[in-house]
Regions:
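Secondary-structure end/capping motifs
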Residues: 234-316
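Pocket-lining segment of extracytoplasmic ligand-binding domains
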Residues: 93, 100-101, 172-173, 178-269
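Conserved C-terminal helix/tail region of periplasmic/extracytoplasmic solute-binding proteins
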Residues: 307-338
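Short, low-complexity disordered leader/linker segments with a strong preference
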Residues: 1-40, 338
Length: 338
């Protein structure tokens, strides 16, 4: 199955880049967090169009969040800049995105605390190369098409680092991830960092192959939910209830995939069969998997190292001036208690 990318999914939205606000109750323009009848604060959450966020939509549309006493409203905001600006302005309480994105924005003063893992890219992203290039170390000196400042560039930097190389060792050609795949297919570059469907297309290319994919690095590109520090401070019981309820949503989804994903077809613009087919490359995490990724405050999970490495990467290319500490940006306690 050719899994749609975040950008491809955005094109399927009715209005690309616009805010499509969906609420369990009526939308409020207030920046406060009103209480529900259970005493929990309303949660205003934003994310882009992506299969890994289906569980959040299912939680709202199925009524499972509401049944848990939660009032969750979500906004689909494709542009990450708009998303974080809304968070900074106080119009949102939480955002779902990747740890590398959280690291960059945290260092720029838009602070969030990651509390819950949603999914991982397990083969949905990768590096394609000429068949003559058989290992990562042979990328040294090669032209590599990659989108500057993107998660794809972060993935490249990470793969190079574990093979004792850096971005300085390759000649980067700045192209979007989709265009990078097309450039490789056309023979204009010997290497490209891209995603599906270009990875599958490369497998059919007699002159190319998938050198490495996120299947070999399943903890690098993941999605998390991060709340503002003030929301966590003022409403810890709401965050705890949200994490617990999300776990129940995923358990329900795994037991009843046809019915559960039926709630997400409009959001994703895909039929249930297509959504289910993407699960091999974008598996939705259970709370158990999320706990393993986060670890505890005493014994950190992999997310801490990923966050730090991402921060180091952004600093190296001049996107941020200092590397943020993961200790204030990650809180595993809600998962521990869920």
């Amino acid at each position: 199955m050719k899994i749609p990318t975040r950008k491809q999914m955005a094109r399927l939205a009715a209005i690309v880049g616009a805010i499509a606000l969906v609420a369990v109750t009526a939308t409020t323009s207030s920046t406060a967090a009103p209480r529900t009848h259970t005493g929990f604060a309303k949660i205003r959450l934003a994310f882009s169009t992506w299969n890994g966020y289906a569980g959040l939509v299912i939680g709202v549309k199925s009524g499972m969040f509401k049944k848990a006493g939660l009032d969750v409203q979500y906004s689909v905001i494709e542009d990450p800049v708009e998303r974080f600006n809304a968070l900074k302005a106080g119009s949102l309480d939480a955002i779902a995105t990747t740890p590398d994105t959280f690291a960059r924005t945290y260092a720029r003063g838009i602070k969030t605390v990651q509390v819950l893992g949603l999914d991982a890219s397990v083969g949905g992203d990768g590096i394609v190369a000429d068949k003559k290039i058989t290992n990562v170390k042979q990328l040294k000196g090669q032209k590599v098409a990659v989108s500057a400042g993107s998660t794809s560039q972060w993935f490249l930097a990470y793969v190079l680092s574990v093979n004792h190389l850096s971005l300085k060792d390759v000649k980067q050609v700045d192209l979007t991830s989709g265009d990078a795949g097309a450039a490789f297919a056309a023979g204009r570059v010997p290497v490209a960092v891209t995603w599906q469907p270009w990875l599958d297309r490369t497998k059919k290319n007699p002159n190319g192959h998938v050198l490495v994919s996120s299947k070999q690095y399943p903890t690098i590109i993941t999605d998390q939910v991060g709340f503002t520090p003030s929301f966590i401070k003022d409403h810890p019981e709401t965050v705890q209830a949200f994490v617990k309820a999300y776990g129940a949503v995923i358990d329900y989804t795994k037991s009843n995939p046809d019915k559960a994903f039926g709630y997400a077809t409009k959001y994703l613009g895909q039929p249930v069969s297509a959504i289910k087919a993407t699960l091999k490359e974008v598996p939705l995490w259970t709370l158990r998997q999320s706990r393993a990724y986060y670890g505890t405050s005493a014994k950190h999970g992999q997310i801490y190292a990923i966050f730090t490495k991402a921060g180091q990467f952004w600093k190296t290319i001049g996107e941020i001036s200092s590397v943020p500490s993961p200790n204030g940006a990650i809180d595993p306690s809600f998962l521990t208690k869920a």
